[in-house]
């Protein structure tokens, strides 16, 4: 285990307080005032600041209610014997001195910041293997326990994802061989691409689950659900909607270009050339002329088929009867955005525990696991039912059954964890 060192913030805190105390003690402040006053009379007291500070300490230590005080000060080469110097002090003198001290402290603070941050960085990079060894060992032990706990649902999900990927590859090859004769070439092109993306994201969900990141896995399921809903609508509504979806790449590019152009200077990026801007403007005119003004909106590709000039994902979801999953979609959205719900409620925190989750957890994996299996089965079924045959119908039913088994196993393990936690709390009570 790496040797513990004082935290850089603590080092700065102590150094800053020491500097602050030395600069703001009464004798130091008064000595600063005396230095300024002597300078006004042609005497460079800064060369003898320590002597002035001792004189200031004497003045402050001597109890007096008089408006005037005197002290003797020997400054070699500055004051001859017997010379009297009158110094008048008021609030302005103190304010000016305090301003000077404040400036000095700020300057000193920056120096301390620079020095300590450089030292801290050197310490961090000095021996990373020793520093990370303890964390790595803890992480490895956690993942072994996690794998043992969730072994069965993980295995079933692996089988499910592998099967859907295999079906996708076979189906993609078969459908594309038929595409020259098919009227729904665009549908095949879009749905196969959406299916491929969904399988890819399913792999990301698996990786997050196997590392104990329930909330991250849930956020990636949200993407799987969006892909599935989109594929369903396009497959149901046919070639025209598929062609609009493909054409909407242009609308998305126009929107992205306008946003880029707005912030290019701030980000110190090269702005879009006048030639490219003119080309994008012409594309916007062409798309609006061909598909109508609503087409340029978000989800504008679905505006015509939904008879809605400003469709949303929720309206597409409802059109394919998957709005029943909206509560889970909202739950996943909470993990993505910075809202209060997602901050105070985390899937990886069990029950009513009020902890701050800053790493992996062995609980809460069931939601993303079972929903990922469901969405993957749904979109693979969409792919299978384009030009359906006996095999595709059978495999769609197999996927439905396998998805149910995945769900059962994930829920079973989560309930066992919750039951064991209740028993543990009961024993501690």
Residue ranges and their predicted role:
Residues 1-58, 62-65, 69-76, 80-179, ...:
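Secondary-shell segments that build the walls of catalytic and ion/ligand-binding clefts
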Residues 180-183, 239-241, 347:
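Short, structured secondary-structure boundary patches
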Residues 216-259:
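Internal, hydrophobic cores of structured domains that mediate oligomerization or house catalytic pockets
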Residues 198, 205, 224, 231-232, ...:
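Alpha-helical solenoid scaffolds that mediate protein-protein interactions
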Residues 166-234:
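Long, hydrophobic/aromatic-enriched structural stretches that serve as scaffold segments
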């Amino acid at each position: 285990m790496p040797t513990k060192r004082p935290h850089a913030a603590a080092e700065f805190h102590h150094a800053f307080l020491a500097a602050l105390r030395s600069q703001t003690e009464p004798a130091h402040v008064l000595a600063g005032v005396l230095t300024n006053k002597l300078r006004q009379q042609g005497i460079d007291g800064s060369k003898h600041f320590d002597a002035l500070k001792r004189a200031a300490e004497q003045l402050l230590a001597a109890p007096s209610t008089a408006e005037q005080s005197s002290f003797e000060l020997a400054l070699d080469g500055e004051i001859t014997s017997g010379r009297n110097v009158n110094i008048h002090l008021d609030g302005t003198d103190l304010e000016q001195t305090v301003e000077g001290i404040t400036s000095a402290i700020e300057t000193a603070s920056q120096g301390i910041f620079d020095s300590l941050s450089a030292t801290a960085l050197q310490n961090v990079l000095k021996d990373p293997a020793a520093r990370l060894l303890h964390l790595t060992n803890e992480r490895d032990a956690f993942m072994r326990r996690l794998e043992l706990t969730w072994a069965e649902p993980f295995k079933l999900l692996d089988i499910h994802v592998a099967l859907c990927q295999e079906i996708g590859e076979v189906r993609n090859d078969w459908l594309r061989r038929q595409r020259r004769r098919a009227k729904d070439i665009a549908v095949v092109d879009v749905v196969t691409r959406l299916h491929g993306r969904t399988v890819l994201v399913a792999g990301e969900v698996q990786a997050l689950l196997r590392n104990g990141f329930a909330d991250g896995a849930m956020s990636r399921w949200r993407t799987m659900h969006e892909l599935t809903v989109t594929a369903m609508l396009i497959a149901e509504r046919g070639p025209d909607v598929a062609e609009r979806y493909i054409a909407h790449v242009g609308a998305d590019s126009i929107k992205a270009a306008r946003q880029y152009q707005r912030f290019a200077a701030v980000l110190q990026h090269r702005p879009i050339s006048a030639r490219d801007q003119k080309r994008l403007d012409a594309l916007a005119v062409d798309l609006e002329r061909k598909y109508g003004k609503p087409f340029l909106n978000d989800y504008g590709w679905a505006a015509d088929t939904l008879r809605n000039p400003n469709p949303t994902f929720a309206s597409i979801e409802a059109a394919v009867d998957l709005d029943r999953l909206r509560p889970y979609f909202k739950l996943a959205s909470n993990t993505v955005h910075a809202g209060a719900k997602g901050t105070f409620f985390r899937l990886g925190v069990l029950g009513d525990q009020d902890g701050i989750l800053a790493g992996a957890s062995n609980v809460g994996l069931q939601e993303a696991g079972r929903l990922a299996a469901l969405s993957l089965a749904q979109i693979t079924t969409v792919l299978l039912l384009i030009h359906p045959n006996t095999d595709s119908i059978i495999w769609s039913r197999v996927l439905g059954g396998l998805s149910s088994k995945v769900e059962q196993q994930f829920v079973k393990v989560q309930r066992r964890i919750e039951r064991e936690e209740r028993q543990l709390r009961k024993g501690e009570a």
